[in-house]
């Protein structure tokens, strides 16, 4: 999808630091193939720097409230660098791609079974600049309306600006129920020749 560095080995300081990030790998034992994966770190394993800031792969993007650090982080897994191997991506017509994301979620579910204290997943999701800007604005508005962080637990250092007229979006997403607004979002994004990104759908 265009993510990562494009290098044959995509390793950074978070992979080699003391108590580094771990890898969740989804394996197809019949074909002996890697299906996909995530990089993750348990909140209980997060260390703080000299200024008291968490050493996280997302720390350059977000400011974390004390409430989040004390009450949520110990019960959280930070996720990042998700991928589905090309042969298993949903754009492929064969059956391989149909259940790839489901298998990935099964892997995340397995983590919560192994670590029953975990209640939350946290991380960033990439939407590329090539994605239709109006479509992106509609998705952002919809997510802020129905899943907004009212307690300011995690705040972006550089918030994404919605360029589409706010009143227009308010009139478009005028329903009180999530499902009704979602139907509008899906219809409008498709009318632009786009699809809602799979991870956006999955995380909702």
Positions of PLM-derived features:
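Short secondary-structure capping/junction motifs at helix and strand boundaries
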Residues: 2-6, 33-37, 118-120
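A short helix-loop-beta-strand connector motif used in the catalytic cores of GNAT acetyltransferases and
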Residues: 16-25, 48-49
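Conserved beta-strand in the GNAT
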Residues: 25, 32-42
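Core nucleotidyl-transferase/polymerase catalytic module
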Residues: 19, 31-32
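Acyl-donor binding region in acyl/amide transferases
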Residues: 46-204
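Residues that flank catalytic or metal-binding motifs in active/ligand-binding sites
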Residues: 20-22, 36, 75
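Catalytic micro-motifs at enzyme active sites that drive phosphoryl/nucleotidyl and oxygen chemistry
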Residues: 10-15, 26, 63-69
């Amino acid at each position: 999808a265009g993510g990562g560095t494009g290098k044959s080995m995509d390793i950074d300081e978070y992979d080699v630091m003391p108590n580094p990030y771990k890898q969740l790998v989804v394996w197809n034992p019949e074909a002996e193939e890697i299906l996909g994966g995530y990089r993750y770190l348990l909140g209980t394993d997060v260390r703080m720097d000299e200024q008291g800031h968490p050493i996280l792969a997302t720390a350059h993007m977000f400011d974390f409230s004390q409430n989040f650090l004390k009450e949520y982080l110990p019960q959280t897994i930070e996720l990042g660098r998700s991928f589905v191997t090309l042969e298993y991506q949903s754009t492929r017509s064969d059956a391989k791609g149909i259940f790839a994301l489901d298998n990935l979620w099964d892997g995340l579910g397995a983590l919560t079974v192994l670590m029953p204290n975990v209640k939350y997943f946290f991380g960033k999701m990439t939407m590329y600049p090539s994605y239709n800007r109006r479509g992106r604005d509609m998705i952002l508005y919809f997510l802020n309306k129905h899943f907004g962080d009212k307690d300011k637990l995690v705040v972006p250092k550089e918030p994404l600006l919605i360029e589409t007229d706010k009143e227009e979006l308010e009139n478009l997403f005028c329903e009180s129920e999530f499902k009704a607004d979602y139907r509008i979002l899906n219809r409008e994004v498709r009318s632009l020749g786009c699809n809602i990104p799979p991870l956006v759908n999955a995380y909702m």
